[in-house]
C-alpha cells in the first residue's frame, strides 16, 4: 500500500479499531474481486457466508455462497433486486468476514465502531451475537425497512448547513407531528445524510443545487433514522429480543447511542434506535482514540467511513492514526 511520508508503516499498526459501515456504501463487485485475490479474505468469506447461509435456508432466501463466490457472481443491481433481505445479509456477512481477515492479519481489534446497520456486524464480530443470530437480526431489520417509506440523500456540507437547507426547502415539519425531513447521519464536517419522504427530499435536493451543495440520493428504497418509523422500530426490537447475547470480546461504540455499549444495555431497543434516532460518527471516532489505536480499518467493502474517519481525526490530531479501507485499496498488505 502506498503510504504518506508521515504515516506509520504496517508493522506499527497496533491496537487497531474496526469501523463497521451502514448500507450506503456496499459494493458486491469489490467483495468478489478481493475474495478471489486475497487468500485470507477468501477463507473468511467462505466461513462466514457458510454460517449466514444456514439463515438464508431457514428464511427462504437464495444461498449466498454459491452466488457470491461462484463463477457468475451477481451485480449490485441483481443483489438489490433479489428477495428482501438478501443484500442486507450479503453486507452483514461481508463486514464480519473482513473483520475476521483483518483480525488474522493484524490482531483482534481494541474496539469497534458501528454505524447504523453496521452495529449488527460490529456486535457479531465482538461475539455478542452468533453469526447466525446476527444474520437473523439483519434479515429482521430488512423486513422492518420494508415498512419505512421514503429515502435518504447525502449532502456535501456540514450539519449546520444541512439544517439550513431543510428550512429553506420548507421540509422541517410544523410541530404537529414528525418532521418531513431530518438529519439522519452526520459522517463528518463535510458529509451529512438526510431522511424523509421522496417528494420532500426532492425539494431539499433542489435547495442544495441552488446553493451549489452536492446532493446524491442513496440507492436505498427506504428511509431510516427518522422519528416517524416508531412502529417498525418496535417490531424490530421484539424480533431481536429472541436472540441470546454474550459478553463482548472487545468494546463496541455506537454512532446512534453516542457511546460504548455496556452489559446492562437493552441491545434490542438500542439497535431499534437506528430506525428512529440520528447517527453521529465524529463523537464515537474521538471516543475510540482512548484505546490509542495505531490504525483504523473499515470493515466493509467501501471507503466512505474511512474517508470520514480521516477527515475527523486529522482535524483533532497531528499526526492522526492511519486509516485504511482494505477492500478499496488494491495494494493493501494483507
Q: What is the role of each PLM region?
A:
Residues 166-170, 201-211:
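Short amphipathic alpha-helices in soluble, non-transmembrane regions
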Residues 159, 196-201:
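Helix N-cap motif at beta-to-alpha junctions
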Residues 179-184:
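A short linear hydrophobic-aromatic micro-motif
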Residues 2-168, 172-176, 214, 218-220, ...:
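FabD-like malonyl-/acyl-CoA
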Residues 149, 185-193, 219-222, 247-248:
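Short Gly/Ser/Thr- and Asp/Glu-enriched loop/turn motifs at secondary-structure junctions
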Residues 213-299, 303, 307:
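Acyltransferase
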Residues 173-176, 210-211, 243-245, 313-319:
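Short helix-capping segments at alpha-helix termini
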Amino acid at each position: 500500500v502506498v503510504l504518506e511520508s508521515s504515516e506509520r508503516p504496517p508493522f506499527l499498526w497496533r491496537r487497531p479499531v474496526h469501523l463497521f459501515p451502514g448500507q450506503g456504501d456496499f459494493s458486491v463487485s469489490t467483495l468478489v474481486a478481493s475474495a478471489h485475490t486475497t487468500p485470507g479474505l477468501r477463507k473468511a468469506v467462505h466461513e462466514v457466508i457458510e454460517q449466514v447461509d444456514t439463515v438464508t435456508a431457514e428464511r427462504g432466501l437464495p444461498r449466498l455462497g454459491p452466488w457470491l463466490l461462484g463463477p457468475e457472481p451477481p451485480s449490485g443491481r441483481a443483489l438489490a433486486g433479489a428477495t428482501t433481505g438478501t443484500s442486507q445479509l450479503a453486507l452483514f456477512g461481508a463486514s464480519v468476514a473482513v473483520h475476521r481477515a483483518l483480525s488474522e492479519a493484524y490482531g483482534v481489534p481494541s474496539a469497534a465502531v458501528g454505524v447504523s446497520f453496521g452495529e449488527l456486524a460490529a456486535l457479531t464480530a465482538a461475539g455478542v451475537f452468533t453469526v447466525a443470530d446476527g444474520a437473523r437480526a439483519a434479515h429482521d431489520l430488512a423486513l422492518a425497512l420494508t415498512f419505512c417509506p421514503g429515502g435518504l440523500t447525502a449532502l456535501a456540507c456540514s450539519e449546520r448547513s444541512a439544517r439550513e437547507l431543510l428550512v429553506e426547502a420548507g421540509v422541517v415539519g410544523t410541530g404537529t407531528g414528525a418532521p418531513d425531513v431530518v438529519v439522519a447521519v452526520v459522517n463528518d464536517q463535510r458529509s451529512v445524510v438526510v431522511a424523509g419522504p421522496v417528494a420532500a427530499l426532492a425539494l431539499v435536493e433542489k435547495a442544495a443545487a441552488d446553493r451549489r451543495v452536492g446532493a446524491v440520493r442513496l440507492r436505498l428504497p427506504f428511509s431510516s433514522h427518522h422519528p416517524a418509523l416508531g412502529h417498525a422500530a418496535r417490531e424490530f426490537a421484539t424480533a431481536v429480543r429472541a436472540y441470546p447475547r454474550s459478553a463482548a470480546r472487545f468494546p463496541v461504540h455506537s454512532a446512534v447511542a453516542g457511546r460504548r455499549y455496556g452489559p446492562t444495555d437493552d441491545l434490542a431497543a438500542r439497535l431499534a434506535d437506528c430506525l428512529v434516532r440520528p447517527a453521529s460518527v465524529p463523537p464515537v471516532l474521538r471516543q475510540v482514540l482512548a484505546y490509542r489505536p495505531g490504525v483504523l480499518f473499515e470493515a466493509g467493502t467501501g471507503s466512505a467511513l474511512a474517508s470520514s474517519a480521516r477527515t475527523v481525526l486529522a482535524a483533532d490530531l497531528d499526526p492522526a492514526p492511519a486509516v485504511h479501507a482494505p477492500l478499496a485499496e488494491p495494494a493493501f498488505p494483507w
